[in-house]
C-alpha cells in the first residue's frame, strides 16, 4: 500500500478516548477539509475526505461529541477525481456546530486559523489537530531525497497554526505557499518518523523507516567503489536507524516488557538491515512478518505510553542521538 493511504487508514482506526482530543481532531478536519455555506440564512457545514474510514469516523464523532446528526454522501470517481470522495454534511444545527468547533466566533464571524482551545490546549490536542489535518489533506511521499510529509491548508492562518502545533510537539515544520496554495511541510526524515508516531501511525512509521533504511543501504552499495571513511560512517547511520527506537523502548520498559515483545525488539536491534520477513525466519519459533511487525508496534506503543505517564522522552526522542552515535562510531 502507498504510504499516504496506509497512514490515513491506520489513524482513522486509532481509538481516542479523551474528549478534548476528539474535539480537536474534529475541529481540524472541518477546518482543513470543510467549508461553510449559507443556505436560506442558515449555516451548512461540509467536509470532503478521500477515505471512507475517515468520513465515518468524523460522522460518528460529530454525533457522539457534539450531538449533531450528519449525512454521508459518496461521490463516485469522475472528471479530475481518480477515486471516490466522501462528503460529511451537517444541515440541522450547522450554525451551532460551527461555534462548537471554532469555525466561527461567538458573533458568527469566521475564524481563519485553528480555534483558541486547540491552539492553547495540551500536547494531546496538538497531536489530535495534526491527525485531523492529515486525514483532511495530508500526504506522505516515499523515503528518498525529496521525502516529505505535507498538509494542504485552507489559508496562511491555518498553516501557521499547524506549524505552531508541530513546534509544541518539538517537530520542525515550515509553512510555504506554492502556486497560490498554502502548505505545511516536514522534510527531515527523523522528524517525519517522530510525527507519524505522534499521530499514532505505529505500523506506518515502521514501514516508512524500513523503506528509508533500505534505500540508504542500496544507495551505499551502489557507491561502494568510491567510498572513503566518511561515506562508510554514513552507511552506519542506516544500520543504527532501524534499532534506535526499539532500543529506547527496551530502556524505558526495563523488566516490565513482556518477553515475546522483548525478543522481537532484540531481533530488530541485532539484525538492523533484515526485512520483517527475514526477522520472522530468525525467530524461535519462526514468526510471520505481520507477527513481528505487530510485536514491535506493541513494544513501541507500550513504551511511548509508559514514557508519557512518567513524563520522560519517548522512543522517537532517542533516534537522532543514536544516529549521531552511529555516525561517530
UniProtKB/Swiss-Prot annotation:
Q: Which GO terms describe its biological process?
A: cell division; regulation of sporulation
Q: Which UniProt keywords apply?
A: Cell cycle, Cell division, DNA-binding
InterPro entries registered for this protein in UniProt: Homing_endonucl (IPR027434), Sporu_reg_WhiA_N_dom (IPR018478), Sporulation_regulator_WhiA (IPR003802), Sporulation_regulator_WhiA_C (IPR023054), WhiA_LAGLIDADG_dom (IPR039518)
Q: Name one GO molecular function term.
A: DNA binding
Q: Does the keyword Cell division apply?
A: yes
Keyword rRNA-binding applies:
no
- What Pfam families does its record include? HTH_WhiA, LAGLIDADG_WhiA, WhiA_N
Known DNA-binding region: 275-308
Q: What does this protein do, in the record's words? A: Involved in cell division and chromosome segregation.
Q: What family is it from? A: Belongs to the WhiA family.
Q: What is this protein called?
A: Probable cell division protein WhiA
Q: Which organism is it from?
A: Streptomyces griseus subsp. griseus (strain JCM 4626 / CBS 651.72 / NBRC 13350 / KCC S-0626 / ISP 5235)
- Gene symbol of the encoding locus: whiA
